[in-house]
Protein backbone atom coordinates (compact mmCIF):
# COMPACT_ATOMS: atom_id res chain seq x y z
CA UNK A 1 0.00 0.00 0.00
CA UNK A 2 2.80 2.38 0.96
CA UNK A 3 4.63 1.51 -2.27
CA UNK A 4 1.50 2.25 -4.32
CA UNK A 5 1.01 5.61 -2.59
CA UNK A 6 4.65 6.52 -3.19
CA UNK A 7 4.39 5.70 -6.91
CA UNK A 8 1.22 7.81 -7.17
CA UNK A 9 2.86 10.80 -5.48
CA UNK A 10 5.93 10.42 -7.70
CA UNK A 11 3.73 10.39 -10.82
CA UNK A 12 1.94 13.58 -9.72
CA UNK A 13 5.24 15.32 -8.98
CA UNK A 14 6.66 14.41 -12.39
CA UNK A 15 3.49 15.61 -14.09
CA UNK A 16 3.73 19.01 -12.41
CA UNK A 17 7.42 19.26 -13.32
CA UNK A 18 7.11 18.42 -17.01
CA UNK A 19 3.75 19.95 -17.90
CA UNK A 20 4.00 23.10 -20.06
CA UNK A 21 0.59 24.29 -18.89
CA UNK A 22 -0.23 26.52 -15.94
CA UNK A 23 -3.43 27.54 -14.28
CA UNK A 24 -5.56 29.49 -16.71
CA UNK A 25 -9.10 29.67 -17.96
CA UNK A 26 -10.38 29.36 -21.51
CA UNK A 27 -12.11 32.72 -21.14
CA UNK A 28 -10.54 35.86 -19.76
CA UNK A 29 -12.46 37.49 -16.94
CA UNK A 30 -11.20 40.95 -17.90
CA UNK A 31 -12.34 41.37 -21.51
CA UNK A 32 -15.07 39.51 -23.33
CA UNK A 33 -14.10 37.92 -26.63
CA UNK A 34 -16.78 39.90 -28.47
CA UNK A 35 -15.38 43.19 -27.14
CA UNK A 36 -11.98 42.68 -28.74
CA UNK A 37 -11.08 44.98 -31.59
CA UNK A 38 -10.73 43.44 -35.04
CA UNK A 39 -7.54 43.76 -37.05
CA UNK A 40 -9.54 45.37 -39.86
CA UNK A 41 -10.42 48.27 -37.53
CA UNK A 42 -6.81 49.46 -37.25
CA UNK A 43 -6.13 52.82 -38.87
CA UNK A 44 -4.04 53.26 -42.02
CA UNK A 45 -0.43 52.22 -41.50
CA UNK A 46 -1.00 50.94 -37.94
CA UNK A 47 -0.77 47.23 -38.79
CA UNK A 48 2.55 47.56 -40.59
CA UNK A 49 3.96 49.77 -37.85
CA UNK A 50 2.91 47.29 -35.14
CA UNK A 51 4.80 44.58 -37.01
CA UNK A 52 7.81 46.87 -37.25
CA UNK A 53 7.68 47.68 -33.52
CA UNK A 54 7.25 44.19 -32.15
CA UNK A 55 9.28 42.15 -34.61
CA UNK A 56 11.93 44.18 -36.40
CA UNK A 57 12.88 47.20 -34.29
CA UNK A 58 15.70 47.09 -31.78
CA UNK A 59 14.74 47.65 -28.14
CA UNK A 60 16.36 49.97 -25.63
CA UNK A 61 17.97 47.63 -23.09
CA UNK A 62 20.52 48.59 -20.48
CA UNK A 63 21.24 48.30 -16.77
CA UNK A 64 22.42 50.59 -13.98
CA UNK A 65 21.75 53.96 -15.61
CA UNK A 66 21.18 57.19 -13.68
CA UNK A 67 19.90 60.62 -14.71
CA UNK A 68 18.66 63.84 -13.11
CA UNK A 69 17.96 65.45 -16.50
CA UNK A 70 14.47 66.21 -17.78
CA UNK A 71 12.74 67.85 -20.71
CA UNK A 72 9.30 68.17 -19.10
CA UNK A 73 8.33 67.26 -15.54
CA UNK A 74 6.90 63.88 -16.59
CA UNK A 75 10.07 62.82 -18.45
CA UNK A 76 13.61 61.66 -17.71
CA UNK A 77 16.34 62.36 -20.28
CA UNK A 78 19.21 59.89 -20.51
CA UNK A 79 22.01 61.72 -22.30
CA UNK A 80 24.51 59.60 -24.20
CA UNK A 81 22.27 56.54 -23.87
CA UNK A 82 23.11 55.33 -27.38
CA UNK A 83 26.80 54.78 -28.06
CA UNK A 84 26.83 53.28 -31.55
CA UNK A 85 23.49 54.30 -33.04
CA UNK A 86 23.47 55.76 -36.54
CA UNK A 87 21.16 58.64 -35.59
CA UNK A 88 20.44 58.94 -31.88
CA UNK A 89 22.53 59.92 -28.87
CA UNK A 90 19.93 60.49 -26.15
CA UNK A 91 16.82 58.68 -24.89
CA UNK A 92 13.82 60.61 -23.54
CA UNK A 93 11.54 58.47 -21.37
CA UNK A 94 7.96 59.70 -20.98
CA UNK A 95 5.68 58.74 -18.08
CA UNK A 96 2.06 59.23 -17.08
CA UNK A 97 2.87 61.51 -14.16
CA UNK A 98 5.50 63.37 -12.17
CA UNK A 99 4.95 60.91 -9.31
CA UNK A 100 6.35 58.09 -11.44
CA UNK A 101 9.30 60.27 -12.45
CA UNK A 102 10.12 61.03 -8.81
CA UNK A 103 10.45 57.30 -8.13
CA UNK A 104 13.23 56.90 -10.72
CA UNK A 105 14.92 60.27 -11.30
CA UNK A 106 18.43 60.35 -9.89
CA UNK A 107 18.37 56.66 -8.98
CA UNK A 108 20.08 53.65 -10.52
CA UNK A 109 17.63 52.13 -12.98
CA UNK A 110 17.35 49.46 -15.65
CA UNK A 111 15.60 50.14 -18.95
CA UNK A 112 13.85 47.79 -21.36
CA UNK A 113 11.43 49.17 -23.91
CA UNK A 114 10.46 50.03 -27.46
CA UNK A 115 11.76 53.40 -28.63
CA UNK A 116 10.99 55.56 -31.65
CA UNK A 117 12.36 58.61 -33.42
CA UNK A 118 9.64 59.81 -35.79
CA UNK A 119 7.45 62.33 -33.92
CA UNK A 120 9.63 62.15 -30.82
CA UNK A 121 9.02 65.49 -29.11
CA UNK A 122 11.80 66.68 -26.83
CA UNK A 123 15.56 66.73 -26.44
CA UNK A 124 18.01 67.58 -29.21
CA UNK A 125 16.14 67.44 -32.56
CA UNK A 126 17.02 64.38 -34.69
CA UNK A 127 19.43 63.15 -32.01
CA UNK A 128 16.91 62.03 -29.39
CA UNK A 129 14.72 58.92 -29.40
CA UNK A 130 11.61 58.61 -27.23
CA UNK A 131 10.24 55.76 -25.14
CA UNK A 132 7.21 55.30 -22.88
CA UNK A 133 8.00 53.75 -19.49
CA UNK A 134 10.13 50.62 -19.44
CA UNK A 135 12.02 51.59 -16.26
CA UNK A 136 12.67 49.63 -13.05
CA UNK A 137 14.91 50.26 -10.05
CA UNK A 138 18.28 48.54 -10.32
CA UNK A 139 19.21 47.88 -6.70
CA UNK A 140 17.77 44.84 -4.89
CA UNK A 141 15.70 43.84 -7.90
CA UNK A 142 17.59 40.78 -9.13
CA UNK A 143 16.29 37.23 -9.06
CA UNK A 144 18.71 34.52 -7.93
CA UNK A 145 18.08 32.83 -11.29
CA UNK A 146 16.39 33.88 -14.51
CA UNK A 147 12.61 33.58 -14.53
CA UNK A 148 11.07 31.82 -17.51
CA UNK A 149 7.44 32.89 -17.64
CA UNK A 150 4.91 30.11 -18.42
CA UNK A 151 2.44 30.93 -21.19
CA UNK A 152 -0.98 29.47 -21.94
CA UNK A 153 -2.11 30.13 -25.50
CA UNK A 154 -5.50 29.36 -27.04
CA UNK A 155 -6.13 29.65 -30.78
CA UNK A 156 -9.88 29.59 -31.41
CA UNK A 157 -10.33 27.81 -28.08
CA UNK A 158 -7.72 25.12 -28.73
CA UNK A 159 -4.70 25.21 -26.44
CA UNK A 160 -1.27 25.38 -28.06
CA UNK A 161 2.10 24.77 -26.43
CA UNK A 162 4.47 27.73 -26.13
CA UNK A 163 8.20 27.14 -25.47
CA UNK A 164 9.16 28.04 -21.91
CA UNK A 165 12.10 30.10 -23.22
CA UNK A 166 9.78 32.54 -25.01
CA UNK A 167 9.48 35.18 -22.26
CA UNK A 168 12.07 35.58 -19.53
CA UNK A 169 13.46 38.16 -17.12
CA UNK A 170 16.06 38.48 -14.39
CA UNK A 171 14.05 41.09 -12.45
CA UNK A 172 11.84 40.60 -9.38
CA UNK A 173 9.69 43.56 -10.35
CA UNK A 174 9.50 43.85 -14.10
CA UNK A 175 7.60 46.17 -16.41
CA UNK A 176 4.72 44.62 -18.28
CA UNK A 177 6.25 46.22 -21.36
CA UNK A 178 9.37 44.02 -21.10
CA UNK A 179 7.26 40.86 -21.01
CA UNK A 180 4.79 42.05 -23.63
CA UNK A 181 7.49 42.91 -26.15
CA UNK A 182 8.90 39.39 -25.94
CA UNK A 183 5.49 37.72 -26.11
CA UNK A 184 4.32 39.69 -29.15
CA UNK A 185 7.57 39.03 -30.99
CA UNK A 186 6.86 35.33 -30.60
CA UNK A 187 3.26 35.81 -31.78
CA UNK A 188 4.48 37.60 -34.90
CA UNK A 189 7.09 34.93 -35.60
CA UNK A 190 4.78 31.97 -34.96
CA UNK A 191 1.32 33.26 -35.94
CA UNK A 192 2.03 36.27 -38.22
CA UNK A 193 0.08 38.36 -35.72
CA UNK A 194 0.52 41.69 -37.49
CA UNK A 195 0.57 40.45 -41.08
CA UNK A 196 -2.22 41.45 -43.41
CA UNK A 197 -4.65 38.76 -44.57
CA UNK A 198 -2.94 38.46 -47.96
CA UNK A 199 0.36 37.64 -46.21
CA UNK A 200 -1.05 34.80 -44.11
CA UNK A 201 -2.22 36.99 -41.24
CA UNK A 202 -5.01 34.68 -40.10
CA UNK A 203 -5.41 36.07 -36.56
CA UNK A 204 -8.17 38.71 -36.51
CA UNK A 205 -8.54 39.41 -32.78
CA UNK A 206 -6.46 38.74 -29.69
CA UNK A 207 -5.94 39.33 -25.98
CA UNK A 208 -2.89 38.98 -23.74
CA UNK A 209 -3.29 38.79 -19.95
CA UNK A 210 -0.51 38.98 -17.35
CA UNK A 211 -1.51 37.14 -14.16
CA UNK A 212 0.19 37.17 -10.75
CA UNK A 213 -0.84 35.52 -7.50
CA UNK A 214 -0.77 38.76 -5.50
CA UNK A 215 -1.74 41.61 -7.85
CA UNK A 216 -4.59 42.45 -10.25
CA UNK A 217 -4.02 41.10 -13.74
CA UNK A 218 -2.99 43.37 -16.61
CA UNK A 219 -4.36 42.87 -20.11
CA UNK A 220 -3.95 44.32 -23.59
CA UNK A 221 -6.16 43.98 -26.63
CA UNK A 222 -3.60 42.93 -29.25
CA UNK A 223 -5.31 45.07 -31.90
CA UNK A 224 -6.53 47.79 -29.55
CA UNK A 225 -3.72 50.28 -30.21
CA UNK A 226 -4.71 53.83 -31.06
CA UNK A 227 -3.42 55.91 -33.96
CA UNK A 228 -1.01 54.86 -36.69
CA UNK A 229 2.51 55.73 -35.56
CA UNK A 230 4.76 54.66 -32.71
CA UNK A 231 4.16 57.81 -30.66
CA UNK A 232 0.55 56.71 -30.15
CA UNK A 233 0.75 52.93 -30.67
CA UNK A 234 3.21 52.59 -27.78
CA UNK A 235 1.39 54.90 -25.38
CA UNK A 236 -0.10 51.89 -23.56
CA UNK A 237 3.25 51.62 -21.75
CA UNK A 238 3.29 55.19 -20.46
CA UNK A 239 2.00 54.10 -17.02
CA UNK A 240 5.23 52.09 -16.56
CA UNK A 241 3.16 49.27 -15.05
CA UNK A 242 5.30 46.77 -13.12
CA UNK A 243 4.42 43.35 -11.71
CA UNK A 244 6.09 40.73 -9.53
CA UNK A 245 7.62 38.12 -11.80
CA UNK A 246 8.19 35.36 -9.27
CA UNK A 247 4.68 33.86 -9.32
CA UNK A 248 3.16 34.85 -12.62
CA UNK A 249 2.06 33.47 -15.96
CA UNK A 250 0.67 34.80 -19.22
CA UNK A 251 -2.58 33.84 -20.94
CA UNK A 252 -3.01 34.59 -24.66
CA UNK A 253 -6.28 34.26 -26.59
CA UNK A 254 -6.18 34.39 -30.41
CA UNK A 255 -9.16 34.26 -32.78
CA UNK A 256 -9.21 33.84 -36.55
CA UNK A 257 -12.70 35.28 -36.96
Swiss-Prot record:
Record: residues binding Zn(2+): 211, 249, 251
Pfam families: Stap_Strp_tox_C (PF02876), Stap_Strp_toxin (PF01123)
Listed PROSITE patterns: STAPH_STREP_TOXIN_1 (PS00277), STAPH_STREP_TOXIN_2 (PS00278)
Gene3D superfamilies xref list: 2.40.50.110, 3.10.20.120
Top-rank taxon, per record: Bacteria
InterPro entries recorded: Enterotoxin, Staph/Strept_toxin_CS, Staph_tox_OB, SuperAg_toxin_C, Superantigen_bac, Toxin_b-grasp_Staph/Strep, Toxin_bac
Statement: the UniProt record of this protein carries the keyword Disulfide bond: yes
GO CC aspect terms: extracellular region
GO molecular function: metal ion binding; toxin activity
Disulfide pairings: 120-130
Cofactor: Zn(2+)
Main location: secreted
Localisation: Secreted
Free-text cofactor note: Binds 1 zinc ion per subunit. The zinc ion is necessary for the toxin interaction with MHC class II.
Role played: Staphylococcal enterotoxin that activates the host immune system by binding as unprocessed molecules to major histocompatibility (MHC) complex class II and T-cell receptor (TCR) molecules. In turn, waves of cellular activation, cytokine production, and migration into the lung tissue and airways occur via alphabeta T-cells. Also causes the intoxication staphylococcal food poisoning syndrome. The illness is characterized by high fever, hypotension, diarrhea, shock, and in some cases death.
Oligomeric form and interacting partners: Monomer. Interacts with MHC class II molecules alpha/HLA-DRB1 and beta/HLA-DRA chains. The interaction with MHC-II molecules occurs at both zinc-dependent and zinc-independent sites. Interacts with T-cell receptor beta variable 7-9/TRBV7-9.
Family, per entry: Belongs to the staphylococcal/streptococcal toxin family.
Record protein name field: Enterotoxin type A
Origin species: Staphylococcus aureus (strain Newman)
